[in-house]
């Protein structure tokens, strides 16, 4: 999965520059979709809500965060290196976007730990 961080990267660009980057971004994404390397991807709205420990709902993301998530691509690749190679082609990198590359877990890590603890207790 590619997670795109930074939402104000285009500030200071002219309309023409923004259009050029947008065109490059869409060409990149459509190419990944056509090749089967990307299976989904969307930008995220700027506003959201956060539910915490006591089920208190607060506004988010917070303005002081410089790492606001702006969107994602869900990839279908064989290796982390392949995902990293795709991330390095992100048209937003020269403008300050940061791309986090994460594998989607096949199982919740907590459930895996519980299962391992149960197996250890039986041994």
Task: Name each model feature, range by range.
Residues 1-123:
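Conserved, structured core segments of small domains
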